[in-house]
Amino acid sequence: MNAADISRAPPGYLEVAWIADTCKLLMGLGWTTNYAGMIYKSLKDRTYGMALMPLCCNFAWELTYAVIYPFGSRQDKFTHYFGLMLNCGVMYTAVKNAEREWTHAPLVRRNLPFIFIICIAAWTTAHLALALQIGPSHAQAFSAYGCQLLLSVGALCQLLSRGSSRGASYFLWFCRFFGSLVLIPQDVLRYRYWRQDHEYMGSPLYIWFVSIFLLLDGSYALCLWYVRRFESEQEEAKKAKSI
């Protein structure tokens, strides 16, 4: 997700830059579709699709790099602006429906508006602090990796704790998984042909991130299948009792 200055790119990278640009375009398409799908699914199921902490972190990231540190190509800026707009819709459905998911925790339920505000403010300051520490260009990439892992963990934990597929679907999973997965070929191209500015993409930490991302999101698909099978068995058992 690093917004590298293409004017510094070596000739070898320029020959394959169109592939990297296509990957970024597909990333935007995948995540845009995911956001729109989450809004629809949340309104339909009267719940929220993204766990609260990752949602606030992701919203703060979009806010930081669409409004506070807008930079990059026109395509990058449009992607951030549009992503922020859709994230506002995702946030709206979460605020609207969160109370229904927290009946088991009255203290949390009564203070959900404050929790949203505090979490968004805290994550925004975290993104800003990282941008001031290492520069917006690298901070955008590193914090995006962090957002992705938090989202993957949050989605898996939310699915298992609910024991229900409400707010979730294979389509939503595939859109976000594909939207993040397609950036890996882009990073490989940058590391291979533009290593001077992308040395960290061959680091143990980056390899660990990719491995954990694949493990978590792959596990999510399996868990969603298991939860849906359990729901189907429960429904069949209810029908059998009513006969």
From Swiss-Prot:
Role according to the record: Terpene cyclase; part of the gene cluster that mediates the biosynthesis of the diterpenoid pyrones subglutinols A and B. The first step of the pathway is the synthesis of the alpha-pyrone moiety by the polyketide synthase dpmaA via condensation of one acetyl-CoA starter unit with 3 malonyl-CoA units and 2 methylations. The alpha-pyrone is then combined with geranylgeranyl pyrophosphate (GGPP) formed by the GGPP synthase dpmaD through the action of the prenyltransferase dpmaC to yield a linear alpha-pyrone diterpenoid.
UniProt subcellular location: Membrane
Pfam families: Pyr4-TMTC
InterPro entries linked to this entry: PaxB-like
Membrane topology: Multi-pass membrane protein
UniProt signal peptide: none
Originating gene: dpmaB
Enzyme class name: lyase
Protein name per its UniProtKB record: Terpene cyclase dpmaB
Pathways per UniProt: Secondary metabolite biosynthesis; terpenoid biosynthesis
EC number(s) recorded for this UniProt protein: 4.2.3.-
Keyword Lyase attributed: yes
MF term (GO), any: lyase activity
GO cellular component: membrane
Domain of life assignment: Eukaryota
Key words, A-Z: Lyase, Membrane, Transmembrane, Transmembrane helix
Biotechnology: Diterpenoid pyrones display various biological activities and subglutinol A shows insecticidal and anti-HIV activities.
Protein family membership: Belongs to the paxB family.
Ranges annotated as spanning the membrane: 11-31, 51-71, 112-132, 141-161, 169-189, 207-227
UniProt main location, coarse: membrane
GO BP annotations listed: terpenoid biosynthetic process
Organism: Metarhizium anisopliae (Entomophthora anisopliae)
